[in-house]
Swiss-Prot record:
It holds the Pfam family PP_kinase_C. This is Polyphosphate kinase. The active site is at H435 (phosphohistidine intermediate). Mg(2+) binds at R375, R405. It comes from Neisseria gonorrhoeae (strain ATCC 700825 / FA 1090). Belongs to the polyphosphate kinase 1 (PPK1) family. HAMAP family: Polyphosphate_kinase. The gene is ppk.
Length: 685
């Protein structure tokens, strides 16, 4: 195999992940309304794919057209491959929505009504709705020398309206643009009595098509064509020109809405001359045009399951388990002082993490609280608890990562509120995203200071903690808590990195540790000792780690990798990676935990980490890897995080040498193993 073929294309691998997500929308074992949600997730993922990865490829093609990255292809070649794969995925997605999901939903009396199928009473209600809810809000923009083509917001819904006639001022007009504000719903529910007692929805685009003429009185509407522009959403801040990072990011957030276009979506009924006109306005080519058979934004269909009261068509609710030791009246610090606590979300409640900060805020023995925030959502109980602690005159330090992609606005808002409450807010280290998930509480106990720390694989986000699978460790281990304190001092202050006792950190020691542990397993295999690596992560694309894994495989190390998303390593290639197996698990929960286990001659060195095996995590972010050494906790991490995932034959996909995936299935006589359901049964309490 040539050097160029040893590494797969990361963008194609990311699209392959979205094909696995789309398979959930096809799976008849998944409740029907949840299948619709998975369809929407794919659309949301594709939006981000174009905003970030395709935008990066376009910039790379412009700046370095001859450069060949790890996969050996020039940017233009990769763009062509990725465009073809994206078109195939999008066609499949719309075919699934139009020809499978809509008919199945209709059989459950959940209808998406097209204009041609509206009844008389539905037409009357829709017209009244337009007059009452839409007409006062919409502002048409006629195109003439005094009204140039407007700049549509990123991913906004717009309409190109063809007109015939003259307006009140005698101006002839051939074209106007109507922008649909984001506050408007993209699907409008009809009253049940108009839908035979079931649920009915109409698309905003259909309502506008039917009544757009009311925006142009006295003129003839010849055509109305929806379009949606996706823009480059990279957010860049020049370190040398920035005096106030928060203010600079606020400015960049506005500018991001108007980045360069990377994709134009139109309905497949849009005439060629309108397509060409729009492409010219946005300086795009036919290669960046996507014609879809249906509404140009399927993401907003995610509102439908919440509007339909059909529990039988949704996942049954789960209640996270709570550790028996964590009684309602048991102070968490008393428990952690006795032994560390391992939490596995969402199967076990995130509440102990919130309780830790809440108790710290109210505890007179607590002197200081420190915490990182990467993503925490708009409705956080943790941030108000930190504010309460600051208002109680405790020393509160919060490292807020303002550059967390697509959460920048939330984080700017929280940072402002924390500062107003008296917290010491730090925006990390310029040039390095603070992706580590860590919190530290310092108490005075019996006249001495005692530290308590939480370290996790996932964000301090109560919303995603109910969906994402993650591990968290709450510990009073003196060496680990001292390390966490050192990391906070590094981030908030200046000076050289401190020496850590147990933790590994990016960008200094984590990559070396991973490479070193792989090399040690390689040497063990060469010496005839048992050698094994098992790891779970979201993405694996860092080339030096991949090459180290190839060397380990060649030496006989048995390697099992559970990689949910991107993986550019080729498994199962004779002479290269025949001892490497890669699987991806896609189910109801989003697999998000990062767990590494190196056999080490039977010692099973085990870590939970905030870092995937990507270049950005190793070299451009501040990350942590925490060793799990307590025997019972290590046993749990290995079993729940790795062994049960390797046994899954229900939601697992097995990666092939060419980068494709096939679905795992029980062998003849083998019982079904479902990682996520089995973990709910094990941990819900």
């Amino acid at each position: 195999m040539t050097e160029q073929n040893r590494i797969l294309c990361r963008e194609l691998s990311l699209l392959a992940f979205n094909r696995r997500v789309l398979a959930q929308a096809e799976d008849k074992n998944v409740p029907l309304l949840e299948r619709l949600r998975f369809l929407c997730i794919v659309s949301s993922n594709l939006d981000e794919f174009f905003e970030v990865r395709m935008a990066w490829l376009k910039r790379e093609n412009k700046l370095h057209p001859r450069r060949r990255p790890d996969n050996g292809k020039m940017p233009s070649e990769t763009i062509a491959d990725v465009t073809e794969a994206a078109r195939s995925l999008i066609r499949h997605q719309y075919d699934l929505f139009n020809n499978v999901l809509q008919p199945e939903l209709a059989r459950e009396s959940i209808h998406f009504y097209r204009r041609r199928n509206w009844t008389g009473t539905q037409k009357k209600w829709i017209e009244d709705y337009f007059d009452r809810e839409l007409l006062p809000i919409l502002t048409p923009i006629g195109l003439d020398p005094s009204h140039p083509f407007p700049r549509p917001l990123n991913k906004s819904l717009n309409f190109a309206v063809e007109l015939d006639g003259t307006d009140a001022f005698g101006r002839p007009s051939g074209m106007a643009i109507v922008q649909a504000p984001r506050i408007l719903p993209r699907v409008v529910p009809l009253p049940s009595e108009l839908c035979g007692g079931g649920h009915g929805f109409v698309f905003l685009s259909s309502i506008l098509h039917a009544h757009v003429g009311k925006l142009f009185p006295g003129m003839n509407v010849k055509g109305c064509h929806q379009f949606r522009l996706t823009r480059d959403s990279d957010l860049t801040v020049d370190e040398e020109d920035v005096q106030n990072l928060r203010a600079a990011i606020q400015n960049e957030l506005h500018d991001r809405e108007y980045g360069d276009g990377v994709r134009l979506e139109v309905a497949d009924t849009c005439p060629a001359y309108i397509r060409d006109f729009l492409l010219a306005q946005f300086r795009l080519t036919d290669a960046e045009l996507y014609q879809v058979k249906g509404p140009v934004n399927l993401v907003r269909l995610n509102a439908v399951p919440d509007l339909v009261n059909r529990p039988d068509l949704k996942f049954p609710p789960h209640t996270p388990g709570r550790l028996k030791a964590l009684g309602k009246n048991s102070p968490i610090f008393d428990l952690v002082r006795q032994s560390p606590i391992l939490l596995h979300h969402p199967y076990q409640s995130f509440d102990p993490v919130v309780d830790m900060i809440r108790e710290a805020a109210a505890d007179p023995a607590v002197l200081a609280v420190k915490m990182t925030i990467y993503r925490t959502g708009t409705r956080s109980e943790l941030v108000p608890a930190l504010m309460k602690a600051a208002l109680a005159d405790k020393q509160v330090t919060v490292v807020v990562e303002l550059m967390a992609r697509f959460d920048e606005a939330n984080n700017v808002n929280w940072a402002k509120q924390l500062e107003e409450a008296g917290a010491h807010v730090v925006y990390g280290v310029f040039g390095y995203k603070v992706h580590a998930k860590m919190a530290l509480v310092i108490r005075r106990e019996d006249g001495v200071l005692k530290r308590y720390a939480h370290l996790g694989t996932g964000n301090y986000h109560q919303g995603t903690s109910r969906i994402y699978t993650d591990f968290g460790l709450i510990t009073a281990d003196e060496q680990i808590t001292a390390d966490v304190n050192t990391l906070f001092m590094e981030i908030t202050g200046l000076g050289k990195p401190g020496r850590l006792n147990k933790l590994y950190q990016s960008p200094f020691t984590l990559h070396k540790m991973v490479i070193g542990r792989i090399a040690r397993e390689t040497e063990h295999a060469k010496a005839g000792k048992p050698a094994r690596i098992t790891a779970k992560m979201n993405s694996l694309i860092e080339p030096t780690v991949i090459e180290a894994l190839y060397r380990a495989s060649a030496a006989g190390v048995q390697i099992d990798l559970i990689v949910r998303g991107m993986c550019t390593l080729r498994p199962g290639v004779k002479g290269l990676s025949e001892n490497i197996r890669v699987r991806s698990i896609v189910g109801r929960q989003l697999e998000h935990a990062r767990v590494y286990c190196f056999h080490n001659n039977g010692a099973d060195d085990t870590f939970i980490s905030s870092a995937d095996w990507m270049g950005r995590n190793f070299f451009r972010r501040i990350e942590t890897a925490t060793p799990i050494t307590a025997p019972e906790l290590k046993k749990r991490v290995i079993r729940e995080g790795l062994e049960m995932a390797l046994a899954d034959n229900t939601h697992a996909w097995l990666m092939q040498p060419d980068g494709g995936y096939i679905r795992a299935a029980p062998a003849e006589g083998e019982s079904e193993a479902d990682l996520q359901n089995d973990l709910w049964d094990l941990l819900r309490g």
